[in-house]
Amino acid sequence: MPAHAYLCAMDAHAPLIDPFARPITYLRVSVTDRCDFRCTYCMAEHMQFLPKRDLLTLEELDRLCSAFVGLGVRKLRVTGGEPLVRRNIMEFFRAMSRHLGAGLDELTLTTNGSQLARFATELADCGVRRVNVSLDTLDEDRFARITRWGRLPQVLQGIEAAKAAGMRVKINTVALKGFNEDELFRLVGWCADQGHDLTFIEVMPMGEMGEEERLDQYWALSDLRDRLGERFTLTPLAERTGGPARYVRLDETGQKIGFITPLTHNFCESCNRVRITCTGELFMCLGQEDRADLRAPLRAGAEDAPLRAAIRDAIARKPKGHDFDYSRRHVAGQVSRYMSHTGG
């Protein structure tokens, strides 16, 4: 092979590095905007979903994610909507499992848990070792109210099934003022008893919720952490898992608690991730509107070179950080799209 051709071939598969020298090694891909819940902070109750023809096929998702793995992505998280309501979704997990140990270190998903009892064993067979479950309350009535359509017992059964299949479960809880403040210690205690990690998340300024309503629900995690510190000894952990969370250990229980605080602590300096929507849009930052269309080069032909070039061009536009800010009564940087479309 001529030297210039060799260099071009090498460059085609060089790792993705953004303008701020951050390697891009973590891809979150939304496989559907549909969900069997209607969580109030995530989507409208009578949601207008995208036409199915606009969604990437499972084969296109395979090709797109495989291109990212070839460019150095080592962690792939499948999201939605609710990923497990996508028809034949296990075909996609089986396809992605071939990359484990061959470039991909971890295949995982974020789910509301409603379909976990059905799919836990298959997911484990595909190499999924960890699963994040969104759970904001252990009160059945509150759960029905916040999810509108969800049933708490179904989710708890799914969590048990995941645990029985050998997967480690992490609970993601959105901190909502006036909703689950009084359940803080109940959630911590339950996770300790069950052996689950727990991460608290600040409500983000996305979707249709009005500014005043979102501000009324906003519970700064600095306050939540102070409340935990009144009952437990919190030891900061240096551990980083490739995500935005910062962790502490509760010395009395030994459990790990995470805090995702995009609004009061900018976690952008170490950002290593990008997001693909179910329609093939690449968002370089959750808190910015800039995006790149990857569906067009994906459908232009079987050759992956234009697709890789489009990915590189997009990564070259990745910003230094987001614009979320709740320090003022105005929600600076509010983003109009739904998390169910971008991928939660």
Curated annotation (Swiss-Prot):
Catalyzes the cyclization of GTP to (8S)-3',8-cyclo-7,8-dihydroguanosine 5'-triphosphate. Monomer and homodimer. Its EC number is 4.1.99.22. This is GTP 3',8-cyclase. S-adenosyl-L-methionine binds at residues 41, 81, 134, 204. Its cofactor is [4Fe-4S] cluster. It comes from the Bacteria. The gene is moaA. Binds 2 [4Fe-4S] clusters. Binds 1 [4Fe-4S] cluster coordinated with 3 cysteines and an exchangeable S-adenosyl-L-methionine and 1 [4Fe-4S] cluster coordinated with 3 cysteines and the GTP-derived substrate. Belongs to the radical SAM superfamily. MoaA family. GTP binds at residues 28, 77, 110, 170, 273-275. [4Fe-4S] cluster 1 binds at residues 35, 39, 42. Residues 19-244 form the Radical SAM core domain. Pfam families: Fer4_12, Mob_synth_C, Radical_SAM. The keyword GTP-binding applies. It catalyses: GTP + AH2 + S-adenosyl-L-methionine = (8S)-3',8-cyclo-7,8-dihydroguanosine 5'-triphosphate + 5'-deoxyadenosine + L-methionine + A + H(+). [4Fe-4S] cluster 2 binds at residues 268, 271, 285. Gene3D superfamilies: Aldolase class I. GO terms for biological process: Mo-molybdopterin cofactor biosynthetic process. It comes from Paracoccus denitrificans (strain Pd 1222). It is an enzyme of class 4 (lyase). Pathway: Cofactor biosynthesis; molybdopterin biosynthesis. One of its GO terms (molecular function) is S-adenosyl-L-methionine binding. Keywords: 4Fe-4S, GTP-binding, Iron, Iron-sulfur, Lyase, Metal-binding, Molybdenum cofactor biosynthesis, Nucleotide-binding, S-adenosyl-L-methionine. InterPro entries: Aldolase_TIM, Elp3/MiaA/NifB-like_rSAM, MoaA, MoaA_NifB_PqqE_Fe-S-bd_CS, MoaA_twitch, MoCo_biosynth_MoaA/MoaC, rSAM. The keyword 4Fe-4S applies.
